[in-house]
Curated annotation (Swiss-Prot):
Kelch repeats lie at residues 101-148, 149-200, 329-373. This is Putative F-box/kelch-repeat protein At3g19410. Keywords: Kelch repeat, Repeat. The keyword Repeat applies.
Length: 373
């Protein structure tokens, strides 16, 4: 008895709910599915909207990008770093680029190097698609980049924002036109802080800024190319420690320590009102209040991840072990006893941890010259 084939539309509808990492395994089983997963922007958008999000904790340094497996179920938390790091050596076009920083937005990674002339690569690790972004011949020292996106007419458009901390020099890169253009000051009356403390949530970039009165949080909207202030849980002229993270692509999380004698607090957003164009309406809840050992001094911009349900954070901490020699140690800290468990030591420069969610999203190529990854 011949089994009837299911209608194509029904098959696509079923596949839209299958997590992205499982779809990758199915690519080799059928040429039609391979084309659907790899080349069909319509299906990629539909899958992005409907499929359950997977979150893969990643650790990056200037040398490699590794997946991690975190175990919080035992009496002592543990972490396993996958043996095989994700490197660009599998792509001969970009194997000579040493990555110094990675920024995640909407399933894509923006990777750039500050060694000599700046190189930028936008990369989808799931599909292996890449695009090399060329920068204009300008001052490279101190230049920073973030990736963001917005939706219009049921399509998703990505842009790159370029900025410096020491000047009011801002540019936008348009993927479709393959070109850079100058834009107006995105933070009038403010100065941006901590270039490595920017995060992307739902396409918008959040970053710290400061004026004469207090430290602020800004949301940069790539659709309007403007920013609005986001009130922090409380105001302060300065903080002993401050850092920013994203919780499961749904909430912002901020680490605050007012002064040396204060507890280290982790807050998350309950509500973010996206409709305002002046000052965002935000409510915060305090998830953790940690009384840490003086030996574990949290500094500005330490990269961290929060497990809101288990009330646990994973955070990097740079420590001087010997004269002129430092190590970055990764700790897991819980609310039950404030105990910090060291789970990993790394020697690479500028380590960071973040949650990556695999996606079939395709990298928009230039309309003037179609590039092949």
């Amino acid at each position: 008895m011949t089994i009837p084939e299911l209608p194509k539309d029904l098959i696509e509808e079923i596949l839209c709910y299958v997590p992205a990492t499982y779809l990758k395994r199915l690519r080799s089983t059928c040429k039609g599915w391979n084309r659907l997963f790899k080349d069909d922007r319509r299906f990629a958008k539909k899958h992005y909207d409907k499929a359950a999000k997977q979150f893969l904790p990643l650790m990056s340094t200037n040398e490699e990008l590794c997946a991690m497996s975190v175990n919080l179920h035992g009496t002592i938390p543990s972490l396993e770093v996958k043996d095989k790091p994700w490197l660009f050596v599998s792509d001969s076009k970009h194997c000579d680029i040493e990555i110094s920083r990675i920024f995640h937005s909407g399933g894509l990674l923006l990777c750039f190097s500050r060694d000599g002339e700046i190189s930028i690569i936008v990369w989808n690790p799931l599909t292996s698609e890449t695009r090399l972004i060329r920068t204009r011949n300008r001052r490279d020292k101190g230049r920073n980049f973030v990736l963001g996106y917005y939706q219009e007419d049921k399509k998703t458009y990505y842009k790159i924002l370029s900025f410096y901390l020491d000047s009011k020099d801002f540019e936008i890169f348009e993927f479709n036109s393959d070109s850079w253009r100058f834009i107006d000051d995105i933070c009038p009356g403010l100065s941006l802080l901590y270039s490595d403390q920017c995060v992307s949530l739902k396409g918008n970039t959040y970053m710290f800024a400061i004026d004469d009165l207090s430290v602020s949080l800004l949301k940069y909207d790539f659709s309007t190319e403007t920013s609005v202030p986001v009130p922090l849980p409380y105001k302060s002229r300065s903080f002993e420690a401050i850092s920013l993270s994203v919780v499961r692509e749904e909430k912002l999380s901020v680490l605050l320590q007012r002064d040396k004698s204060s507890k280290t607090e982790i807050w998350v957003t309950n509500v973010i009102d996206e409709t305002t164009t002046k000052v965002m309406v935000v409510s915060w809840s305090k998830v953790l209040s940690l009384d840490l050992s003086p030996d574990l001094k949290i500094r500005y911009g330490e990269s961290f991840l929060l497990d809101e349900e288990k009330k646990v954070i994973m955070i990097f901490n740079n420590r001087m072990e010997e004269e002129n020699k430092s190590e970055d140690k990764l700790y897991i800290i819980g609310d039950d006893d404030n105990k910090a468990t060291q789970v990993y030591t790394i020697h690479g420069y500028g380590p960071a941890v973040f949650n990556y969610f695999p996606s079939l999203v395709q990298i928009e190529q230039s309309s003037r010259q179609e590039e092949k990854s």
